């Protein structure tokens, strides 16, 4: 099939012949994922993302552990901000590929968007149980940052600050964690020097970010430096 695609491309012919042949193959309901995945990749190469979606889902029906298909569908769901679809893909993803931290991460974000705080907290804690020595520190940091946000939503401030501290151990430049940690400290009127230092780092990193500028200005106001 690959050779047929190459020959078709080299001959300068349109994609109709290739797609027709693939559709005939798909009608036979193949029990291996290789050909459907090749078909999906071909459709994507032609910019036919919408048509590729059902084919990729068929790949997952045949082989739920196929990360290429799931990640491609997930990428499209993220671009569309389709949080329900993100949940569907990632809930299945953490079961079929429990060591893929990306599925936990996007699932936690989707749960947050749905205001399912306890679920976001639980999935992040589950993700941390799968962290290995070679896991990306930035990703681990993000999980702790989400945990911090979740604990703060539940008014568990001490637990939130401990989670933010862990986030910054793994990635001292985690801008989101720095900003939220600084802001929440300032609201409580505690550790204001620490809050100012953290907030300053966010402004230095992204000087045109209005959210970080507002946090920094607020902390200075609370400290009386205005």
Q: Which residue ranges define each predicted feature?
A:
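Structural motif corresponding to the intra-repeat A-B loop/turn of tetratricopeptide repeats
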Residues: 11-12, 46, 80, 114, ...
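Residue-level recognition of tetratricopeptide repeat
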Residues: 41, 75, 109, 149, ...
């Amino acid at each position: 099939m690959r050779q047929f695609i190459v020959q078709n491309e080299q001959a300068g012919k349109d994609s109709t012949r290739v797609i027709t042949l693939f559709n005939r193959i798909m009608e036979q309901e193949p029990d291996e994922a290789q050909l459907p995945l090749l078909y999906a990749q071909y459709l994507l190469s032609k910019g036919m993302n919408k048509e590729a979606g059902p084919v990729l889902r068929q790949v997952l029906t045949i082989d739920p552990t196929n990360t290429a298909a799931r990640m491609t569908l997930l990428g499209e769901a993220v671009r569309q901000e389709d949080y329900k679809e993100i949940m569907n893909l990632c809930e299945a993803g953490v079961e079929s590929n429990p060591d893929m931290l990306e599925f936990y991460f996007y699932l936690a974000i989707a749960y947050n968007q749905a205001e399912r705080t306890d679920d976001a907290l639980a999935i992040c804690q589950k993700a941390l149980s799968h962290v290995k020595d070679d896991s990306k520190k930035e990703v681990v940091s993000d999980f702790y940052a989400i945990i911090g946000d979740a604990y703060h939503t539940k008014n568990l401030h001490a637990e939130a600050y401990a989670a933010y501290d862990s986030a910054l151990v793994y990635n001292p430049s985690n801008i989101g964690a720095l900003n939220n940690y600084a802001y929440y400290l300032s609201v409580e009127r505690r550790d204001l020097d620490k809050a100012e230092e953290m907030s300053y780092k966010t402004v230095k990193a992204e000087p045109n970010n209005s959210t970080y500028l507002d946090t920094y200005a607020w902390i200075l106001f609370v400290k009386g430096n205005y």
